[in-house]
Amino acid sequence: MIAFNMDEHQLKHIHLIGIGGISMSAIAEILLENGYHISGSDMKESNLTHKLRDHGAEIFIGHASENIQNPDLVVYTAAVKADNPERIRAEELGIPLADRAEMLGQIMKKYEKAIAVAGSHGKTTTTSLISLLMEYSNLDPTILVGGELDEIGGNIKIGQSQHFITEACEYVESFLKFYPFIGIILNIDEDHLDYFKDIEHIKSAFKKFAQRIPKEGFLIASYDDAHVREISRDLDCHVITYGIKTKSQFMAHNIEFSFEGLPSFDVSFEGKTIGSFSLNIPGLHNVYNSLAAIATTYVLGVDPVAISKHITRFKGIHRRFDLLGEVKGAKVIDDYAHHPVEIRATLEAAKKYPHKKIWCVFQPHTYSRTQALLKDFAKSFYLADHVIITDIYAAREKDEGIVNSQGLVNLIVQEHPAQYIGGFEEISRYLYDHIEAGDIVLTMGAGDVYLIAQMLLAEK
């Protein structure tokens, strides 16, 4: 149950702990636009804190009890623990507290047509694509995405309509605090096993998310995914299905890939062709993402001709098959893939790209994920010619000594050549010494592996 209801409080001043984060800063910007007095704290200055200060927010660097200056509400991120001095002070003063997901859910309630994009993979790309299709179709949405989107100058754009769109993350069941009119489920996979017990627990969370959609609302469901099919049954809301293999309302046909691996395809709705579509983002996984976007905007009343025209304008987002440059005639591409399914999809996209050899540099993300999916990770790199594994990026976790990157390499080499190199500078030098013109260097992971790509490009 949601502990905080914005409608029950007369709020003027809201304080955000961790205001410099990409999501919290966007929430702060929306609240500022709606006339709230905003204060907040973060551990360091950034472009986001400077931007918020310019918009009128009061920003404190560092966390301290004296930063709590009688706000009506305190909002905190998952990274802010119960022993944070500002949380402690708010509790002492009896000030209501809400976590980031609760606050975002309360904002969603203010919009008649809030859209929440859920799924184990593809959320940021699909949210960005739907956002731009809505924007180009003059629906003027308020947009909050989890990545940098050049077309809106960041990750937040405040519109004046009743449309709102954001990602809906399943981790710690955050999305069960949201209020979508349209919910989208792209796929369901085993992930975040430091919280979820197993796939049944994960499916249960997604089912509860779908049940939050009102009777007059819509679930946009990927019917090629067996788990999504299962949880899409027996819902009160309208269910709109899409797929490539399984009979669905929206289906992609005649899929072809250009010389550079870019897909084009026809789409039918309930058996009738509604248009031909070409993407400027590679990979079959992006055909699925675009089908979700096409179905969503079609439900919103956008003409398929307009969807087809505008979909080609989407060039992708930062850290999603992001072509950063060339060194020694080899293309350097960076991607956020950090799950076995995502690794395979990204390598499949790279394989369709013109190349001699694919050099894959993967940084495992969190010890818990690496341990839980170790065997799946080991089987994910078969499309790469050379595999380099870096040290594990710990994120929120501590190293318990149970799993390490050399252990992953030991499993990979049973099927495919791979090596462990811990240091980023050492990896960059190794790549520079071995790559040739026409090769692809692909850095992958949700941590800071992109720094290797930047180091390599600096070598030239």
Swiss-Prot record:
Primary localisation category: cytoplasm
Name of the protein in its database record: UDP-N-acetylmuramate--L-alanine ligase
InterPro entries in alphabetical order: Mur-like_cat_sf, Mur_ligase_C, Mur_ligase_C_dom_sf, Mur_ligase_cen, Mur_ligase_N, MurCDEF_pg_biosynth, UDP-N-AcMur_Ala_ligase_MurC
Residues holding ATP: 119-125
Gene name per UniProt: murC
Pathway where this protein functions: Cell wall biogenesis; peptidoglycan biosynthesis
GO molecular function list: ATP binding; UDP-N-acetylmuramate-L-alanine ligase activity
EC id: 6.3.2.8
Any one GO CC term of the record: cytoplasm
Gene Ontology biological process terms in this record: cell division; cell wall organization; peptidoglycan biosynthetic process; regulation of cell shape
UniProt record similarity statement: Belongs to the MurCDEF family.
Native source organism of the sequence: Alkaliphilus metalliredigens (strain QYMF)
Keywords: ATP-binding, Cell cycle, Cell division, Cell shape, Cell wall biogenesis/degradation, Cytoplasm, Ligase, Nucleotide-binding, Peptidoglycan synthesis
UniProt cross-references to Pfam families, sorted A to Z: Mur_ligase, Mur_ligase_C, Mur_ligase_M
Enzyme class: ligase
